[in-house]
Amino acid sequence: MEVVIKISTTEAKKYLLIDTSVLPDVFEEVIQVKELLRSAKVKDITEAVKKVGISRSTYYKYKDYVFNVSDGLKSQKVTISILIEHRRGTLSEVLDKLAQRCCNILTINQDIPINNTANVNITFDISGISGDVKNIVEELKKIKNVLKVEIVAME
C-alpha cells in the first residue's frame, strides 16, 4: 500500500509519496479508519477506531495529513476554454479529438454564439490520456473553425 503524507511548511504544502513498508503502521491504520467511514461500514469514528485498533486521538492527529494515493492522484482534471466559429460540426470535431486522446469529458458549457463565435468551456479527466495536455491543446488549435484554445485550470 502506498500512502501520501502531507508535510506542512510555513510557505506552502509539500507532499511526498512514500512506500508504507518504511512507515509506522499507524499511518495505514488511519487510512483504514477513513475507508471504513467513507464506505459506511461503521456508524461513527468511535466504532471505526475500535475496529482498527487505534485511539481516537491518534486518528484525529493524522487524519488531515495522511491520504491514500487514490484520494489525491487518481483523477486529474483540466478545464480549457475554446473560442470557435459558429459552424456546424466544429464542437463535434473538438470532442472527437479529445475522445481520440482518451480524455474523459466531465462538463461542457457553451455560450450562445455572438457575432458568429461562441466560447466553450470543457472540463475533462486526463488520468488516462495518451500524450500530454500541451500536445492536445496544439491539436485542438489546428481544427478548422477553432479560433483560440487556452488552459483555464489544471488539477
From Swiss-Prot:
Superkingdom of this protein's organism: Bacteria
Pfam families: ACT_4
Domain ACT: start-end pairs: 79-154
InterPro entries found in the cross-reference section: ACT-like_dom_sf, ACT_dom, UPF0735_ACT_dom-cont
Membership in a protein family: Belongs to the UPF0735 family.
Protein's name according to its UniProt entry: UPF0735 ACT domain-containing protein CA_C1234
Organism in which the protein naturally occurs: Clostridium acetobutylicum (strain ATCC 824 / DSM 792 / JCM 1419 / IAM 19013 / LMG 5710 / NBRC 13948 / NRRL B-527 / VKM B-1787 / 2291 / W)
Lineage: Bacteria, Bacillati, Bacillota, Clostridia, Eubacteriales
